[in-house]
Amino acid sequence: MNANQAAESNLLASNQQKELEDLPKDYPLSTSEDEGDKDEERKHQKLLESISSLNGKDRQKLADRSEASLKVSEFSVSSEGSGEKLVLSDLLEPVKTSSSLAAVKKQLNRVKSKKTVELPLHREEIERIHREVAFNKSSQILSKWDPVVLKNRQAEQLVFPLSKPQSAFAPIEHVVNGWKAGTPLEQEIFNLLHKNKQPVTDPLLTPVEKASLKAMSLEEVKMRRAELQRARALQSYYEARARREKRIKSKKYHRILKKGKAKQALKDFEKLQKVNPAAALEELEKLDKARMMERMSLKHQNSGKWAKSKAIMAKYDLEARQAMQEQLARNKELTQKVRAASESEEEGEGQEEEEEPLVPDLVNEVQIKANGLNPWMFRNHFIDAKEAEVQKDLEDPAEPEAQETSESEEEKAVVEEETLLKEFEERRSLRQKSELNHMAEPVHRRVTKDPSSQEVLSDLRALCQKLRTENHQSGKQELSSARTAQREEPAREEEEPMLLQRPERARTLDELEELGREGCVENEELPRTAVEGLQLEKNLSNHIGAPKEKKRKEQMIDLQNLLTTKSPSVKSLAVPTTVQELEDEEERDQRQIIKEAFAGDDVIRDFLKEKREAVEASKPKDLDLTLPGWGEWGGIGLKPSAKKRRRFLIKAPEGPPRKDKNLPNVIINEKRNTHAAAHQVQVLPHPFTHHQQFERTIQTPVGSTWNTQRAFQKLTMPKVVTKPGHIIKPIKAEDVGYRSSSRSDLSVVQRNPKRLSIRHKKHLENNCVD
């Protein structure tokens, strides 16, 4: 309709235009007519505008006229008035009744049942579907390995290859069944074993025992089983007891156990000696021979390959350390001299082990000389060797001196002297053991050689005897006799070295008080003779005026005073003081030792110089803009004037105060180290949840200096360990308990990826959604 209206309007406009063009040709125009023409044009223009503004709906509809015709065309069919479309079934209505068109009907029904074929998907869409399906399927397959990957990531250490081949051990019966005797000796042994029915393996019961059990009655079998159970229980009890005893680390327990075993062996030997003297003599010869062989073989001297290897591993292995300790104990046992110990000595040793000292060991230490030599530069092993020689000499049995007279008093004095000497030797050995742990010893102590120590001991006994005989005389006579006895030996004392002077160990509070009363410190500035005379007078006056409370203690004090030979370089015994004074003295000695050790190093001056340089380097520098030759002469040897320098000098502002400004003993470097920035952590690492955890881990020391060997190995063990020569294969599904499927949903895509039907696409999409 709109098209018809537009055509009509165009036709009308063209007709009017033609009429206007033809007007001037028919009629000539005048001036008045020109004015009229203008008015007409104006009116015509308005007419055109009004025509163009008209709506097509308001126009009248032209009527169509149809005429009958003899020739009917297919285009003349009109469906006007019906309101329905023409359907193929309407045309086939008259055909339904005819039976000749049955085949056409079937074909028509088949065509009706078929649906329209969808267009094939585009290549990009097919590839996108392939990618989505492959991603979903591969992520589903890989998600099965998440627990395995997480376990490997959380493991402290991974040792590759992960699958360790299990070594197959063939049973002994399989080995024996295929074995044949090759030599006559093997054949003879094999025949004996099979003849007596001895088990080749290690069964619970032998064939003989099985046969005997079959022959037993029920009661005998029960009794036999009860005996076996009791034997097993006893065996397990003794094994547990042996394990408990082996874990005991008490030295006192092992010492008592060792003494008990030695006493039991001695009792068994005495019993054997009474029953069978010949066997006892043979046993004694065996022991002596074994001791001689041990001493000759030197296997106990820590010089063999085994000892050296154990010494290296003793730091890490407890068993190696125990083996080294046993060897050292064996060495000490073999190298010491054989001396029969009396019962009284054994009882005394037992009492000394059981008793605990009431006075601490710090009270008995001798104060070290403040201005002495540096003990770090002194060789202690030389002194230890000399002390060992003196100890061996002192352990030799003393010669009896009581044979000269037959009086009872002299015999008692000799017995007391012998007991005092033995006690002195025992205390001396104890002091030597305790002083092995000291870091330094005074340099001015020296040890006598063998002949000199014997002579001093003989002089000691003579002087003790003189003192006992002259106790009833007057003090003046005792003083004169002691002075004469002292003057007789000056040359010998100057030529020979002195005995090692050691303080007496006070074990009770009474002994501590007595030592406090009797001990005194000698003035070193006095001459030798004056000091000796004063000391002798004081000792003799103490002996005369002191009450006789305990004779044994008095004799021991006399022995100690007489044994102490004075010299300007040797200090006397120090009076026991409190623990605080000893600590102060140790601090002073330590300061003196450090001062002597670092005598050539002026550490404080170097430190102050280094700090001064660091402070100067950290200060902001002034900017000098002076240029030579500007405003004045310049050249070699000419410097800018001070006025010009002050004019062009830009002073730098003062920087912030240093952190170590009020810390004289510290240098704090405030510069940013660019090399350290690469090792700084910007983000918190994965396993940690808080920065304090990470800082605590970083601050924990890792080195072997601050940790035990086991902890150091655990902290520094590598994350991954690979064995050389082994092939590392990838993990298989069978290794972790999964079954590998031979067919998957991706098989269709992998087989023909470019031909993906709609059915397969829907199936794959449903699987992806699931």
Swiss-Prot record:
The modification Citrulline is found at residue 588. Residues 1-65, 334-361, 392-455, 467-505 are annotated as: Disordered. The keyword Disulfide bond does not apply. Citrullinated by PADI4. It is found in: Nucleus, Nucleolus. Pfam families: Utp14. Residues 41-68, 217-291, 318-348 form a coiled coil. GO terms for cellular component: nucleolus; small-subunit processome. Residues 1-17 have a biased composition (Polar residues). Residues 343-358, 396-410 have a biased composition (Acidic residues). Keywords: Citrullination, Coiled coil, Isopeptide bond, Nucleus, Phosphoprotein, Ribosome biogenesis, Ubl conjugation. The modification Phosphothreonine is found at residue 206. The keyword Nucleus applies. There is a cross-link at residues 449, 732 (Glycyl lysine isopeptide (Lys-Gly) (interchain with G-Cter in SUMO2)). One of its GO terms (biological process) is rRNA processing. Interacts with DHX37. May be required for ribosome biogenesis. Belongs to the UTP14 family. This is U3 small nucleolar RNA-associated protein 14 homolog A. It comes from Bos taurus (Bovine).
